[in-house]
Amino acid sequence: MSGGGPEERRYALELDPGEVERYRMMAEQARAAEADLWDLAGIRPGASVADVGCGPGAMLPALSDAVGPEGRVNAVDADPEAVAAARALVAAAGLGNVSVAEGRADHTGLEPGSLDAAMLRHVLAHNGGAEDAIVAHLATLVRPGGCLYLVDVDGTAIRTLPEQADLTDLQERYGAFRAARGDDNRAGLRLADRLARAGLEVLEFRGRYFIGQPPPSVRPPSWAAREAMVAAGVASEDDVRRWDRAFQEVQGAPVAPTIFAPLFTAVGRRPA
């Protein structure tokens, strides 16, 4: 999801239908797996919350339901395409307590001290060098006693079994591409430390594994970054065709591939 920043920090993942479906799948799993942490962070009926780096808005129905008609959800993303997709989702679902605006994760345009909770999911890993500035800005948006809610991944530990050589190559190229951009592919491991450096009290720092077999329409972030990798010269169109054939091969196999991905969540409270 796009946090935004200088032009060279442009979000690398293409927002195609498969990527939108991946966001939706992640949102469904998150609501179930993180219910107690949402409550700890104050994401409950009547709360005013923000989803920063909201992407196409997959998390917005769950947040809208969590805060109820008396609450408010402020969604922000730096990518105009994602903002348009999120607004379309909000309109189609009739989410009257949700607004969507364009803004950067380190300059959201939201009023300081106006939120009970601010959520940032899978943004820090795509904004290498700006992580502390983003967390510091979001910390100013929550009222005293309010919470900042961070979610990210350890991308170096993601595995797919059974392995397929071409898809392993794709994942390794993606890791090298991210490193060359200055991104932190282990951002999830540092969430609690970033909250503490922003002056917040760390209430919870938790890890879990996603283990699942995504539907054929859902491919990993490395695939969504294929055009950016070609543009950067770390992959060719022949590579993209080879990787596409590999996905089709594993999707047609008798045993579907299983993804293992470590996810981390940290909740920090602003001192009263």
Annotate the PLM regions.
Residues 4, 9-12, 17-19, 30, ...:
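C-terminal helical/coil "lid" or tail adjacent to the Rossmann-like core of SAM-dependent
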Residues 108-117:
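A short acidic, Gly/Pro-enriched loop at the edge of an enzyme's catalytic core
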Residues 132-147:
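A short glycine-rich, Lys/Arg-flanked "PGG" loop and its adjoining helix->strand segment in the class I
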Residues 68, 127-128, 142-144:
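Helix-to-beta-strand junctions that scaffold the AdoMet/dcAdoMet cofactor pocket
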Residues 28-45, 62:
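Conserved alpha-helix/loop element of class I SAM-dependent methyltransferases that forms part
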Residues 50-52, 56-108, 133:
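Class I SAM-dependent methyltransferase SAM/SAH-binding core
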Residues 116-130:
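A short SAM/SAH-binding and catalytic strip from SAM-dependent methyltransferases
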Residues 147-216:
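Conserved catalytic/acceptor-binding region of the Class I
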